[in-house]
């Protein structure tokens, strides 16, 4: 399959993101994964960390992962990040239809995404599934289902723990935690 794109706020990136991406590499014949931080997600509140800080956290988290890269087209556009618009750019830049890694929850609501009908014509999807949920298959979407490890960690929980002075050891890479503490990110979020 080659390459895939893993979009998200990454506010902050955590071990769950990294392990899911590694599982996709191993289970779905993907050589490279480009983590693609959204400037602003159309479905989430504005990130707390700045685009520059989230990019730096990704760099620190992924620097020892030879299969992991960062694609910053959405950060550079400085607008709400719509997957369809990014897919058009990625298709031209990489000369192939982009493959996006999405969670099963996102797959179930894909029809609510901006220009969904156009998106599914130009992009492929790897749907990461945790556990034994029944699979609903939408035949309009070119998707591969990938059972990944269940890692119950969320960026929201990490931000709250940091805000209240609780440990996030083993939840995020040490270098990312050092950066967060040095920058004072999430201390008063």
Curated annotation (Swiss-Prot):
InterPro entries: Cyt_trans-like, NadD/NMNAT, Rossmann-like_a/b/a_fold. Its EC number is 2.7.7.18. It catalyses: nicotinate beta-D-ribonucleotide + ATP + H(+) = deamido-NAD(+) + diphosphate. It comes from the Bacteria. Pathway: Cofactor biosynthesis; NAD(+) biosynthesis; deamido-NAD(+) from nicotinate D-ribonucleotide: step 1/1. GO terms for biological process: NAD biosynthetic process. Keywords: ATP-binding, NAD, Nucleotide-binding, Nucleotidyltransferase, Pyridine nucleotide biosynthesis, Transferase. Signal peptide: none annotated. SUPFAM superfamilies: Nucleotidylyl transferase (SSF52374). It holds the Pfam family CTP_transf_like. Gene3D superfamilies: HUPs. PANTHER family: NICOTINATE-NUCLEOTIDE ADENYLYLTRANSFERASE-RELATED (PTHR39321), PHOSPHOPANTETHEINE ADENYLYLTRANSFERASE (PTHR39321:SF3). HAMAP family: NaMN_adenylyltr (MF_00244). Catalyzes the reversible adenylation of nicotinate mononucleotide (NaMN) to nicotinic acid adenine dinucleotide (NaAD). This is Probable nicotinate-nucleotide adenylyltransferase. It comes from Hydrogenobaculum sp. (strain Y04AAS1). The lineage of its organism: Bacteria, Pseudomonadati, Aquificota, Aquificia, Aquificales.
């Amino acid at each position: 399959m080659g390459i895939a794109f893993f979009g998200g706020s990454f506010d902050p990136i955590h071990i769950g993101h990294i392990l899911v991406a590694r599982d996709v590499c191993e289970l779905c014949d993907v050589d490279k994964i480009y983590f693609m931080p959204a400037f602003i997600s159309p479905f989430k509140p504005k990130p707390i960390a700045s685009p520059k800080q989230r990019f730096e956290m990704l760099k620190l988290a992924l620097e020892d992962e030879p299969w992991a890269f960062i694609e910053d087209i959405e950060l550079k556009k400085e607008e709400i990040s719509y997957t369809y618009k990014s897919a058009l750019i990625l298709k031209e830049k990489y000369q192939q239809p982009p493959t996006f890694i999405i969670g099963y929850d996102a797959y179930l609501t894909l029809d609510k995404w901006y220009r969904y009908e156009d998106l599914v014509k130009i992009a492929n999807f790897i749907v990461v599934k945790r556990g034994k949920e029944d699979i609903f298959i939408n035949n309009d979407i070119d998707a591969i289902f990938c059972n990944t490890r269940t890692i119950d960690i969320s960026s929201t929980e990490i931000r709250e723990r940091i805000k209240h002075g609780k440990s996030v050891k083993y939840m995020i890479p040490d270098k990312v935690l050092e950066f967060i503490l040095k920058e004072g990110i999430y201390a008063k979020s």
